[in-house]
């Protein structure tokens, strides 16, 4: 029976179509793909055993499970993963790589000390990242790469000690940033918040801040919490750039002084909370530039109710007539303690107008220069404004292109023009009235002569009379008095004598200012001098090399002369004798015996005397002059 059931391999290869289709390669591939899809679906629908899953595995809760690392088996469909209150210390690279749909990741209240670079790879859709109540000591900037959709980042209550520049520049999409309760924070860089141009909410509460950090890059910030810090004073410019800020909380920040114009940059502010501080007074008209301010909290401050607080009482009546709980009560003097500030009136006090202790002084300047008109009152609680010559009232924050009122009341001109000439009035105000002081600004037009290599000199000369012409034929004329004016290129030469008719003519001369060389001319001259020096040096070097080579060649020729024969031809004057062809010229006697064989001089027809070897020649005054030329073959000598 078994043999009948068994198929031979050949039967399988050549059997019916059914058997061939059973082993079709395409069918095998399709089956494999189905298995992979099923496996993926199984993984996508799995839930870690220690966690609870809901909403078709899109919500995974693993709270208080004593986990030391991110568990395996999390569904790829997960959109919310809560790992709150576990024992996780390190977030390793690619821990969430397969969770491409994850939107909210909660890692708060663990023991996280390290977040590796690339730990959040694959979380392209992550919207919220909670890391508060951990043990991070630095901002894990490198781990934020590729979180292009991150909107909220919670880092509250970590032992972070400093926030460096560009700490969050990798997540420009961020809208909410919670940095509260960084109790070990000691340093915030000037560029710490660079790149967060889309941030709407920033929490810096309880961070041991002693001054407000640079918040200028946060141009779209709506809400700012600075509560629980040590901000003893709020100064002008602290909120520069926060034109869209609507809510400002500075609760229990130990604020003692808010200087004049400190809030002028907060044009959109709707709510401000200054409760639980150490404020006693506020500068006059502090809230006047805040046209959108609706809610203010000033309670639990030791307010000193005197003349300087009257403006606040009037402002509260206008802005919040029914809200008596918002604005606190007087602490001093004793007779007013506990009284609501909004109920105060001028009848309670004896007040005086402000005093200007440093009035502005008249000023003479040249067009294009900077200028300042100072105006200082006896107290900083007053407000200062300026009235320009055309009647415009300028206050701090009402900036023009060139003119601005500084926080100390100074009227500053960055670049004066002739049109700025006129009288400026400083007006110092308090709750009682105003005090004014005026000063005149005189602006002199600057001479703007176009640059020229030539200028015109006007020379006035006199035509001498006939008598003067006879006596001054040999004289040049009256010596003119020359007056060079540095502010004007036109120079006038006036003669001392004015008895004759004047004639004026113009002579173009070289510009006076051209006598002083400019930097460009000096540099050009310096370059020419350096170039000449380098050229001379190179020429000298070349000449030295040529001279050395010629000398060496000449020296070599003297020591290694080529083989040659020298023939000396004597041309005698008329020599008398019987037979010139046979005559001999007697030679003087030679003292040395070994030279006796040179005893005669043969005629030109017999002048080839061959000398085989000569060891040495000794010459003296009494010896004949011998001319010797060395040769490898022949040496020819003669006696003269």
UniProtKB/Swiss-Prot annotation:
Please list the residue ranges annotated as the Ig-like C2-type domain. Answer: 354-442
Mind telling me which residue stretches traverse the membrane in this protein?
A: 528-548
| The LRR repeat ranges on this chain | 77-98, 101-122, 125-146, 149-170, 173-195, 198-219, 220-241, 244-265, 268-289
- What biological processes does GO assign it? modulation of chemical synaptic transmission; regulation of axonogenesis; synaptic membrane adhesion
What remark about domains does the record contain? The LRR region is both necessary and sufficient for the interaction with NTNG1.
Which SMART domains does its entry note? Answer: IG (SM00409), IGc2 (SM00408), IGv (SM00406), LRR_TYP (SM00369), LRRNT (SM00013)
Protein keywords: Cell membrane, Disulfide bond, Immunoglobulin domain, Leucine-rich repeat, Membrane, Phosphoprotein, Postsynaptic cell membrane, Repeat, Signal, Synapse, Transmembrane, Transmembrane helix
First and last residue of the signal peptide? 1-44
PROSITE patterns (UniProt xref): IG_LIKE (PS50835), LRR (PS51450)
| Protein name, entry field | Leucine-rich repeat-containing protein 4C
Q: Where in the cell is it found?
A: Postsynaptic cell membrane
Q: How does it assemble?
A: Interacts with NTNG1 and WHRN.
The primary site where this protein sits is membrane
